[in-house]
């Protein structure tokens, strides 16, 4: 639990004091990206004239969403100098998970707030986090539904509800669930997409999700849900250590 709070505090402090990125789940990062892949930066180019964007050639190792491309554009500076607080520079040879979206010029853009996960650089992220995220993306890439989680949902109760699973162990580190809502945000159905090894844990997680109150994350007055709106959610299990019991959370730490 201490590791969870430490990592969460770092994520939140980064979003508050640097680039205001916020914290996203893996499912939402996948859902709101045009292109998702495990890849490697093989060549960087000079910044485009008058823009804080530079081109980078990539080598795709695994493609999870979108079409194969040979390059992306990075929001930052290729000379690695300080620009804005959101500027980044990714050295050649860096292996990472790329989450990209298209800008108004139809360019695939990655940046500080894209949800990038570096795989061969020293970061405060654990090896287990990287492994979980790669496995999760492989699972999400197999979904029949491609246009998911268009409207983000939120529950202030979920963290406390998942705390009731503290001390319950699982051989698997994550589960994915599909929630179906009415236009009025009433939960109609819930299914296991890629569950935990133990069916008993899936049942308890689904019971928690069923008894949770959900609301729109933003634009509550202007956003209207479609009938039978499907929302996918990822839940993670962290095993016990010497001082703490195992626990479950919606964050991949």
Language-model segment annotations:
Residues 171-197, 209:
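Short tight loops/turns at secondary-structure junctions
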Residues 163-165, 193-200:
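A short acidic/small-residue loop/turn micro-motif
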Residues 203-253:
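Short, positively biased Gly/Pro-containing turn/loop motifs at secondary-structure boundaries
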Residues 4-13:
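Sec-dependent N-terminal signal peptides
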Residues 16-176, 226, 236-244, 249-253:
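Transition segments tied to proteolytic processing and entry into folded domains
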């Amino acid at each position: 639990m201490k590791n969870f709070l430490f990592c969460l505090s770092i994520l939140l402090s980064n979003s508050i004091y640097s680039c205001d990125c916020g914290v996203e789940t893996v499912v939402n990062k996948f859902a709101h990206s045009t292109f998702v892949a495990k890849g490697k930066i093989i060549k960087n180019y000079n910044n485009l004239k008058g823009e804080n964007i530079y081109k980078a050639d990539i080598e795709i190792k695994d493609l999870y969403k979108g079409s194969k491309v040979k390059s992306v554009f990075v929001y930052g500076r290729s000379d690695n100098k300080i620009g804005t607080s959101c500027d980044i520079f990714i050295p050649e040879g860096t292996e990472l998970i790329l989450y990209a979206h298209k800008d108004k010029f139809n360019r695939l853009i990655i940046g500080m707030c894209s949800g990038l996960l570096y795989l061969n650089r020293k970061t405060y992220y654990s090896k287990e986090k990287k492994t979980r995220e790669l496995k999760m993306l492989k699972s999400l890439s197999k979904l029949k539904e491609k246009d998911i989680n268009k409207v983000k949902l939120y529950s202030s109760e979920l963290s406390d509800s998942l705390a009731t699973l503290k001390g319950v162990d699982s051989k698997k580190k994550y589960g994915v669930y599909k929630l179906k809502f009415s236009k009025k945000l009433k939960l109609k159905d819930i299914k296991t997409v890629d569950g935990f090894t133990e069916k008993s844990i899936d049942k308890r997680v689904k019971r928690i999700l069923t008894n949770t109150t959900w609301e729109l994350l933003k634009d509550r007055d202007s956003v209207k849900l479609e009938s039978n709106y499907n929302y996918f959610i990822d839940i993670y299990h962290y095993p016990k250590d010497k001082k703490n019991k195992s626990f479950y959370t919606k964050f991949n730490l």
